[in-house]
């Protein structure tokens, strides 16, 4: 117990706040009651020991090996003293039942939620993280590093240790080996042999993981055993001294052992409180800078200034706990955001714990250009921890004068952006966006950057919004950096950057407004070119597929088609190619559907990579191709999707195309309209019962459309209910037939009956209202023109609300 209490390891674990500190005491209770019950033949003691075995499983993942360790010891006792062990069978049974009873609630949870049991283990176990051929060597290295962590080189991580400090210093290490030798020498005393079994068994959680070694937090279960072994070694030394110096036996052994323990404890205290605790990296890891931030933020708030905290976490819990008022500061999250809050012209002070949240270079440059650095904040030991900047007085005024390029509704204005127009494929795509808040949002918002190719296929997207919407105030401006890793094998060519904003959850995209007019659902940030330089050059892949063009081109991966789709859908497939040599000419491919009889019923041809001809590929370059397949003309049924390249054919997967019920006859309807929208879609009429309605009712409106030609793009239907002043009191926007029949899948002359049920607000006053309908382009948001109205809205009917 003394060895444990004075050890650096136990001191560190007990103060770190991790649940693994609970493993050793619960293990000790389990071992004590199991051993004493086994020796005395006490069934209730063995049952209590089993209960503590079940309890330890509630503490930490590494504790899962404790029942295994106990089982190995029980097997050893059965081998060494079979009669005695079998005579205690009732106690063993009770121990197992008690263990299962205590573990049962947690076991039931794991049964219902197996991911909670497997996920973390799957992230670290060598069997899931390491190629099979490398596992034996890795386990050997882990074993040596784990055992070496006791006496040679300890855990390298400051969170769990003074980096490199072994569990036992040079003067204590010999007693560990001495105690281990004593336990093994008395191999028939099962209570002593439990200690080496315990040591090895509870080292397994560390040995079996693929991580930095040694892993002190995963081997905390060995504490009772390893300190008991050292105690055995000290006891042996004590006895030896008594035999060698019998005349001094009353004080010499006791005095020497006491001095050794005092010295070891003093060194541990010095290492922990005097060395480890004063390290700047420990101060940062333990969130010390946020104590400084909280104090300074409150000072600035009381002085009427606006503190901006640049942090890794929103409203950092350390600051919140110490000084709750620090939460009133402006918090910028992550290293890719720099807000300029405008609070009536109040001075802005930036508090930047730069070691914890290092701003990206583009934002550093902006901060240094716009603000003057002041005296930093220091740790209690004098280390610089938080940099402080004061925003120049004229910056906010200059920001307010900037004109907007576009706006998302009435909430966010895009001021400008910077994006390299030509870049190699060797580095991430970086875009610096400058925007202004126009309003305080009522909920969360998502601002995302999408990258499309010239065929309209999306290749990348990134969401970045370190300035949380609940902090937005009108006039705030923000510099926001987007950094996108390029996909493996992305072809050279031209790409378009699009900026979109939606409500949290990705629903409800905001319209883009330019000069008071809606222009679409995204802000076009322009086109850029990825040059051929920096392609993915890889060693030749083993031929999991045969070469599609012998000696020239190999398909190395493909994305299977969806299991099912509907007629009229567009699906995307991805193929990953490798050039074995530069093709002499440009290669085309064909994707086809084969029916159950192997007959080709549908096919489309494509350039292998439209914007990056194969004649420009480099030898061994890996290039990804993406292909959009329109199923508008594909017949329904089960098919196999196949790839044709020259004379070579490769199946890509099976797909079931579900039939869409199509009609070319006009259905019965309450009123005929015959109004053409655009040049493609005719509204034949509608069905709507004429009975009066009440607030909260649903209008059972059905619109009947007819395609005059095959529509070239997707359109959405809008239904507006307006009052006498023209104000919209209820509306619905959706693709036809509740999003299941996109207009791009319609055939010429096809008739589509489209239910567009509109819910009336519960507080809607009685009176007459007008029902307006129309179509708009799903991408540009532009309404299709109609002969019935200049604004693209057709007055359909009058609705009476009682």
What does each model-found stretch correspond to?
Residues 1-134, 138-243:
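Membrane-integral, polyisoprenol-dependent glycosyltransferases
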Residues 249-305, 309-336, 399-408, 612, ...:
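Membrane-proximal, lumen/periplasm-facing interface regions of secretory-pathway glyco-
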Residues 297-326, 352-353, 430-454, 572-576, ...:
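Short periplasmic/luminal acceptor-recognition loop of GT-C membrane glycosyltransferases, typified by
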Residues 337-418, 424, 506-552, 637, ...:
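Aromatic/acidic, Gly/Pro-rich catalytic loop(s) in extracytoplasmic/lumenal soluble domains
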Residues 421-426, 563-568, 691-696:
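Short, solvent-exposed loop/linker segments at the N-terminal edge
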Residues 438, 484-492, 580, 628-636, ...:
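Short, surface-exposed loop/turn segments at beta-strand-coil junctions that are enriched for proline
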Residues 466-478, 517, 606-623, 734-752:
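Short proline/glycine- and polar residue-rich coil/turn motifs
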Residues 488-491, 501-512, 633-635, 645-650, ...:
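Short acidic/polar inter-strand loop motif in beta-rich domains
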